Amino acid sequence: RPPRSTLFPYTTLFRSVDEIIYTHVSNQNPDSLRFLHDCEKLLGKKITIIQSEEYSSVDDVIERTRCINTPFGAPCTDKLKKRVRMKWEREHPDHHTYVWGYDLNEKNRADRVCKALSDYDHEFPLIEHGLTKEEAHGIADKLGLKRPIMYDMGYPNNNCIGCPKGRMGYWNKIRVDFPEVFERRARQEREIGHSCINGVFLDELEPDRGNINTEIIEDCTIACQLLTWGK
């Protein structure tokens, strides 16, 4: 167990929060729930899990809406996260504050969020404490909290496996790590007639295209949901 001086600043942050909400999507790596329960133990606080009652998965959304991705974001974000969050907010009317995971290197993104969503209150604990994502992972490790396995596999975030917003390098890594997901998404592209990647279908993607280490794919979080509000 870490010494209290190490643990205290981070656990007290969450003890001052009324409720921690987690929007679950079945396409996420199952290890995400392990991480969630480990956080509950560390923080001594139950995390509320909410999930779509209308759609069962990203695949369900793609196949029923006949849409994979758009310039305004992927429909799975709207159906599986945005609408689920909005339903929870309607059932819990109040003035909510959103806590963002942007790190020290993402101040510009934080500024854009505050300007675009001025009706909400926002907190950026990593930026306020001068922490990068890597340093946050290091703190978690010192606290005995194992980060989600997708990071250890070389992915830049813990999005769903087979995120429609992924680029060439991402999809070529999915092809290797999760071939069944790659094949299913490639089939869905052909059935619908649109691709995840602009200009190329997955079944035409050359295995050496792209570099996941240099590509930018945002975390599929509330940021995706709020910044496409009304689109």
What kind of feature is each model-predicted range?
Residues R1-T12:
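Single conserved hydrophobic/aromatic residue that forms the stacking wall/gate
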Residues T11-K231:
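Nucleotide-activated chemistry modules centered on ATP-dependent adenylation/adenylyltransferase
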